[in-house]
Amino acid sequence: MDKKSFEMVLDEIRKAVLTEYKLKAIEYVHGYFSSEQVVDLLRYFSWAEPQLKAMKALQHKMVAVQPTEVVNILNCFTFSKDKLVALELLASNIIDAQNSRPIEDLFRVNMSEKKRCKRILEQAFKGGCKAPHAMISSCGTIPGNPYPKGRPSRINGIFPGTPLKKDGEECTNEGKGIAARILGPSKPPPSTYNPHKPVPYPIPPCRPHATIAPSAYNNAGLVPLANVIAPPPPPYTPNPVGTENEDLSNPSKPIQNQTFSTPASQLFSPHGSNPSTPAATPVPTASPVKAINHPSASAAATVSGMNLLNTVLPVFPGQVSSAVHTPQPSIPNPTVIRTPSLPTAPVTSIHSTTTTPVPSIFSGLVSLPGPSATPTAATPTPGPTPRSTLGSSEAFASTSAPFTSLPFSTSSSAASTSNPNSASLSSVFAGLPLPLPPTSQGLSNPTPVIAGGSTPSVAGPLGVNSPLLSALKGFLTSNDTNLINSSALSSAVTSGLASLSSLTLQNSDSSASAPNKCYAPSAIPTPQRTSTPGLALFPGLPSPVANSTSTPLTLPVQSPLATAASASTSVPVSCGSSASLLRGPHPGTSDLHISSTPAATTLPVMIKTEPTSPTPSAFKGPSHSGNPSHGTLGLSGTLGRAYTSTSVPISLSACLNPALSGLSSLSTPLNGSNPLSSISLPPHGSSTPIAPVFTALPSFTSLTNNFPLTGNPSLNPSVSLPGSLIATSSTAATSTSLPHPSSTAAVLSGLSASAPVSAAPFPLNLSTAVPSLFSVTQGPLSSSNPSYPGFSVSNTPSVTPALPSFPGLQAPSTVAAVTPLPVAATAPSPAPVLPGFASAFSSNFNSALVAQAGLSSGLQAAGSSVFPGLLSLPGIPGFPQNPSQSSLQELQHNAAAQSALLQQVHSASALESYPAQPDGFPSYPSAPGTPFSLQPSLSQSGWQ
């Protein structure tokens, strides 16, 4: 056998594991082995039995051998008895059998074996050699191919059970991996297969999955990510449930929807229906909400919402701010709206109820215009409606249902709902959202929310339209002055916050009480569920905004709030804070109020600051907003909450800061706006804020404390929602609050809690915070679980981190980020968020944030987005987004900035991140919207 063929045989024998397979490798051979080859083959068989079997297999596959060669073969065997057996097998292949001396010498010891050996050789001689001679050894075989019918390893497999090989397959394993060697060749393709020819059936499209974020500016509906784009809306719109289903695919929208649907329904039928409605009827609202959910709807809604917003503004022209607001609204709104969606979702998640509301809220946002949101039609009407709403607040509530649905069903609820989500979102959005949310709530809600709290008095008017608008606007308005000035953006955002606040304020101003109240509720609601909290949130905002004026009112708004507010009020700043604090607090003044005070303080400070100073400006809207927000939100002591709310956006830092700080410090200083402000706000103002933020953070840490601090009682009281929120969150206090609130609270709480939890880390270190955040997040999240929690956690952390990162603006950014987080869902992905955060923070906080936000769920994205949602806030984010802090500041400073912010935000990665944005705001508001949109999905999933 030629060398190549023999190598193939050896390869087959080596591959075979079992003796039977090794023997088959020999039996399948076509060809003859020389004596040397036989000796080589026998080496692969151990011991006598396998070797003899191999000899038997080789018996008829050998070339004739000489006696001396026979000796070499026999020497492969150890025992003479085995050698005799082998000799018998080889006998017929021996050429010169007569010359048997060399063979016989092997059996000299045992006479019987020697005799037998002779006998075998004699018979072989008689029979003659039957083996072919070497010259013809290859007869009948193809050189180089000992297995013309296929290698045994391919035919029978190497191991028992391995598939049989088929002819025509390559015979070598050279260069094959171990798996290929063991498994053998893969099944050959069918003969009809032509890789160059298209298949006769359609190749199913790849399931949409998030890979590279679609362009944030993509309005073409190409981005399946969050179903943000308009096309998807229908599903949502159809009805929450549908949406819900979609949820899976599109977490963001689904959740929202889900929220909507579930929570809504769950929460309350009204809401349930509302959601539907929103989806269906209140286009604006629903749309928005849904829109938010569904991009398209969203868009429409959003748009409408936007318009509405604007409209609302007009509607609420009462609010002077309106005008100012308007711009904001538009931006924010969209943003908000957009955001809402995310937030909503997240929120939703968080609170189911809330969530729903959130959507609502957002919707409301969108709706805003439509306080009538609920009533879609009302939209424009909303203005009035809201007013009515206020009155209707309740209605709102119902209308708001979404919001309402929240626990606060009432406006508060709505607000709350909103808040939580909204709040968060809203809050985040700052007043805007808040208002929006309220709006969403029905717009009315907003009113209610805002108004709601406010309902009581002015609220209606103010609140209502204002709230949303007003709120925004009001915020603006009130702040407006400053704020507005500050930057529409800021303003707007802030405004939103402020507006809330302002709203409140404004209202407050105008009808201070109510408005404030309204706001508060709004804000509060969120968190609180109680109106207060919500209000507080905003109220704080408002309050702050209102600052004094409002304050009282603000406070009033909540009544509880009010009280707190009052107290706060007294400190106007406080007020806001208070309210915020209050928010939850107020109601418990005591419980809340502490908060409130602090909150108020914070708030006010914030607010004040904002308007007042550029710094705030820096946060500018945010800051400011933040403040208010804070106040409201954060302040609210909630901080978290606040965060949640606008506050976050507001300034994170402020918010946080103030909130926290304020919280803690503020608490007293409520008015201390100074403190707050100084602490937070001012600091916050720009850079300080950060410190404050940190402070706040620490506060945060304290936050809890703070909260508690602030709202010690408040906090304690879970009731205080805010506190509770925070506290709750941490505590669980939520419990009280809220259950929803809880969530909210939780959220906030989460925040808080988280903060607290992480408190230290969180608070202080942003960086740490981030991780902390994470951790916190996690915890709080869980605790917060409610929507915010995550948010809070994340939020907080985010905030913190952000803050630190960018002291001045960052904080806000952070805040914003945070907010979003919370909003978004922070929960959803707290971690993600955080992570994003962290990195985002560092780098550009905002954008990262935002981008990350995507991660965050949107919320984060929202970061910028969120804020964007804030719109004004966004500004914040924007700021942050603007990578440069200065930019931030600048932005803050001007309204233009605001839009720029938006844009920036938008442009910022965040937006990019969230192309999903398409939600409804493609344009917008990409950023803001986007994040939210995305968020929802993110968040949603997370929350879910």
From Swiss-Prot:
Q: What does this protein do?
A: Mediates OGT interaction with and O-GlcNAcylation of TET2 to control TET2 stabilization at enhancers and CpG islands (CGIs).
Q: Which domain of life is it from?
A: Eukaryota
Q: How is it modified after translation?
A: Glycosylated. Interaction with OGT leads to GlcNAcylation.
Q: Where is this region: Disordered?
A: 233-285, 369-396, 608-633, 912-944
Which cysteines are disulphide-bonded?
none
Q: Which gene encodes it?
A: PROSER1
Q: Which residues carry this modification: N-acetylmethionine?
A: M1
Biased composition (Low complexity) is annotated at 275-285
What keywords were assigned to this record?
Acetylation
Q: How does it assemble?
A: Interacts with TET2 and OGT; this interaction mediates TET2 O-GlcNAcylation and stability by promoting the interaction between OGT and TET2. Interacts with KDM6A. Interacts with TET1.
What is the name of this protein?
A: Proline and serine-rich protein 1
Task: Return the Polar residues bias intervals.
Answer: 248-274, 932-944
